[in-house]
């Protein structure tokens, strides 16, 4: 950088000799040049940004005492850039107010607090862990795919008040869309006083097949102490076993149960409470959350007992001759006679054709027709007889033994190439387009 004291004359000579586009930038009352903060990139009007450094400096020092300070004191020594013909740009002053960390407000802030630092993880965690507002609900699309199943119809917990699925004790499993079924392993076991069935049915699982017995983590209970003084519905409607609808809720299930007081009449404690023992064998333990295909497979897997065959006297059934109407019988006889006549005419035609000698067709037979194929392959009766006669003749008269080969005589003239003649079975030879 250049000092203003030593280079003031150089600047005056430069602007008077070389710079013809702009006037010298030195003030008339001060020979010091203005300050340039860059190398001269001017993107806007020069009249807006090009201000004299001394005038700007005087305005910044004091507006009221500008004249006295200028005349009494010399201007401060500032560095300046070399002259250039591009417009000069002065950096605009920073008008943002600085935040002072010292003052009465600083005492209220916690120690080490910084406004520009990111929030701590602890604050973010508390913001997300706060309970959601009451207006937030599960989206409709997700609510449709989530299904909370009621207890299995073969292991139901009855109570005097209507059961609610919000109670974990009453929920056997939750089916969420295509992601699968989540089972509740803390389901009320067979030791519960509210349970109708004292133990789970044999081979019962939540998927309806004996292979998944590890889903339930309570063992079978063989002894049953009784239901106590609990008033519970006793008879299950038969329509409950037929219905395989997975969407049946508790209230639909409760409506299908018929109330009865004959609870002491049931002695079978390993299966569902049904009135007949034979129907108990046919019933299959299923779950409300199992798919219909699994329920069908489980039904097939259960082997039904085969009853012992009993000797039953069956009277022989004598088939009665069916009566045919006269009109139908007449039509059948007529059609049979017609078929016999056609068969006889065909056989007669074949006999005549076999006895008749072969005659060369007078007209040319269409190429690749049936008649042409029979003649060209020699399958007519006359051709077959001729072939058999020739065969028997050659067998009776065998040709003489061939003599020893002799050296061929060389022909004196040019060699002749034999031509292949056309051989046909018809009188009229085929004529080629060359002829």
Swiss-Prot record:
Signal peptide: none annotated. It is found in: Nucleus; Cytoplasm. The keyword Nucleus applies. Residues 322-352 form a coiled coil. GO terms for cellular component: cytoplasm; nucleus. It comes from the Eukaryota. Strongly expressed in the cytoplasm of the pharynx muscle cells and several head neurons, probably the IL1s or IL2s, throughout development. Also expressed in some other unidentified neurons in the tail region. Weakly expressed in the nuclei of the T-cells and the T-cell daughters. Not expressed in gonads and in P12 cell. One of its GO terms (biological process) is Wnt signaling pathway. Residues 65-146, 393-419 are annotated as: Disordered. The keyword Cytoplasm applies. Keywords: Coiled coil, Cytoplasm, Nucleus, Wnt signaling pathway. May act synergistically with the Wnt pathways to control T-cell fate specification, gonad development, and P12 cell fate specification. Required for the distribution of pop-1 and tlp-1 proteins. This is T-cell defective protein 2. The lineage of its organism: Eukaryota, Metazoa, Ecdysozoa, Nematoda, Chromadorea.
């Amino acid at each position: 950088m250049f000092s203003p004291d030593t280079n003031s004359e150089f600047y005056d000579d430069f602007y008077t000799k070389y710079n013809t586009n702009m006037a010298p930038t030195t003030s008339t009352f001060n020979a010091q040049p203005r300050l340039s903060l860059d190398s001269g990139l001017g993107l806007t009007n020069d009249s807006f940004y090009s201000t004299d450094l001394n005038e700007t400096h005087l305005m910044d020092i004091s507006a009221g005492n500008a004249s006295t300070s200028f005349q009494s004191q010399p201007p401060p020594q500032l560095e300046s850039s070399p002259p250039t013909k591009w417009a000069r740009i002065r950096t605009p002053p920073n008008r943002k107010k600085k935040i002072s960390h010292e003052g009465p407000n600083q005492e209220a802030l916690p120690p080490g607090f910084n406004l520009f630092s990111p929030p701590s993880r602890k604050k973010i965690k508390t913001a997300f862990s706060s309970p959601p507002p009451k207006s937030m609900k599960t989206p409709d699309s997700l609510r449709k795919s989530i299904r909370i199943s009621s207890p299995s119809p073969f292991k139901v917990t009855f109570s005097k008040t209507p059961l609610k699925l919000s109670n974990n004790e009453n929920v056997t499993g939750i089916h969420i869309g295509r992601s699968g079924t989540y089972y509740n392993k803390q389901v009320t076991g067979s030791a519960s006083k509210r349970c109708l069935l004292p133990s789970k049915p044999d081979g019962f699982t939540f998927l309806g097949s004996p292979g998944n017995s590890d889903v339930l983590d309570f063992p079978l209970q063989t002894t049953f102490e009784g239901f106590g003084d609990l008033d519970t519905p006793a008879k299950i409607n038969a329509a409950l076993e037929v219905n395989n609808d997975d969407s049946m809720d508790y209230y639909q299930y409760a409506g299908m149960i018929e109330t009865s007081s004959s609870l002491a009449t049931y002695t079978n404690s390993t299966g569902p409470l049904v009135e007949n023992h034979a129907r108990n064998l046919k019933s299959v333990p299923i779950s409300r959350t199992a798919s219909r295909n699994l329920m069908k497979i489980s039904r097939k897997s259960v082997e039904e007992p085969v009853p012992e065959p009993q000797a039953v006297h069956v009277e022989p059934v004598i088939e009665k001759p069916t009566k045919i109407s006269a009109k139908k019988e007449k039509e059948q006889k007529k059609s049979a006679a017609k078929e016999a006549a056609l068969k006889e005419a065909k056989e007669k035609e074949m006999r005549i054709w076999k006895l008749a000698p072969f005659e060369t067709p007078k007209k040319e037979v269409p190429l690749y027709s049936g008649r042409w194929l029979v003649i060209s392959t020699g399958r007519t009766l006359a051709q077959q007889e001729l072939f058999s006669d020739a065969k028997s003749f050659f067998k009776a008269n065998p040709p003489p033994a061939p003599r020893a080969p002799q050296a061929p005589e060389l022909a004196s003239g040019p060699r002749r190439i034999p031509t292949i003649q056309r051989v046909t079975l018809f009188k009229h030879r085929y004529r080629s387009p060359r002829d």
